Amino acid sequence: MSEDVSKNLSETLFVKHKQAKETSALTQYMPTSKKILDDREQQEDRAWYRHLRRLQWAWQGLSPIEMEGVLSRIASSTHSRTHDDWLDTVMGYHSGNWTFEWIKLGMEHQRRANDLKGEDAADELFTASLCFSIAGYPHLKNDNLALQAQVLANKAYSEGAEKTQYTIKQIEVPYQKRKIIANLHLPRTDKQLPVVMVSAGLDSLQTDMWRLFRNHFAPKDIAMLTVDMPSVGHSSHWPLTEDSSCLHQAVLNELYSIPYVDHHKVGLVGFRFGGNAMVRLSFLEQEKIKACVALGAPVHDLFTSPKKLQKMPKMYLDMLASRLGKSAVDINSMAGQMMAWSLKVQGFLSSRKTKVPILALSLEGDPVSPYSDNQLVALFSHYGQAKKISSKTITKGYEQSLDLAIKWLEDELLR
């Protein structure tokens, strides 16, 4: 994308949204729930509305120095905020606003791409796409700025796809009178390859996964297929229900018709809520899956502990409400509704084991995915394993554990 085209697209998309409602103010709560949130805000010492995913973003290819640069510009902004205590709630689309600053960084990477060729240019465009995606984080349904940022993320990704030496094809799978859009990444096209279906969480897009393919799967001649969770990104038409794996199951059942992949060698990787969907799919389609990795996946504990759900930061509650399509949120009622999402309550983690080996992994002290959840998954999987990443070596531990998990998956697939 030339600098002028990129600038024009950004200006066209955002010109109507100079005074767009700020993200943290979008979700409406019932009076009793609003009181719970207000009381909690006074007790807690949170400086940000959003959960800052520094480790994940760095692993996905963002420079920590650039990341801190953006965060410091947001933090030091003198513009008015929706919540004075939360640094990332600057109102209006201008300097200091979360979306504005991340879009600005994304456009900087697009500019760099113009001066480069081939793989170097592609890498800059994929990084730009990641910046645009973070600009829309946590991707609430009625967030106009986030929706515009998503348009830029998809455009930059498509342009990166044209420049890279690898082949990226958009696959369309018919489902409930619509089409599921997935991106198939191929290291080569002269033979059928093993394939890994990857799903991110409820607050990120499938276009965030480029580095996973480039650094891990491509060197081993493994294809990667990305699918958005229901209610997010390309899958935003479908509401999220306890049948969290419905879209991925539909895509899995179409793999035999894709000539580039070996549908007898299919692996799964799920991050956060995507892990819930992938574990579920490993029980439903045991004959079609060779191995599964779930990273930080909530499968039981969180859903059956209403008090834990009620104590979640506002961003997570806003995001869940958005995914469930709620316009006015009653926290207690929503916590009760989530009980049905437990894979144990659904009967998967309570009787028979799945043949699929599952590696369940999470950070030590993770409130969303406690070690007990991972142990439960490992217990009901043949050759399943549960692993905990020590928080003492969190930066190193995060990367090493992800590398270890992907290597384990490759070994299972290539047996």
Swiss-Prot record:
<protein>
    <recommendedName>
        <fullName>Esterase FrsA</fullName>
        <ecNumber>3.1.1.1</ecNumber>
    </recommendedName>
</protein>
<dbReference type="Pfam" id="PF06500">
    <property type="entry name" value="FrsA-like"/>
</dbReference>
<dbReference type="InterPro" id="IPR010520">
    <property type="entry name" value="FrsA-like"/>
</dbReference>
<keyword id="KW-0378">Hydrolase</keyword>
<dbReference type="GO" id="GO:0106435">
    <property type="term" value="F:carboxylesterase activity"/>
</dbReference>
<comment type="function">
    <text>Catalyzes the hydrolysis of esters.</text>
</comment>
<dbReference type="InterPro" id="IPR029058">
    <property type="entry name" value="AB_hydrolase_fold"/>
</dbReference>
<comment type="similarity">
    <text>Belongs to the FrsA family.</text>
</comment>
<keyword id="KW-0719">Serine esterase</keyword>
<dbReference type="InterPro" id="IPR043423">
    <property type="entry name" value="FrsA"/>
</dbReference>
<dbReference type="InterPro" id="IPR050261">
    <property type="entry name" value="FrsA_esterase"/>
</dbReference>
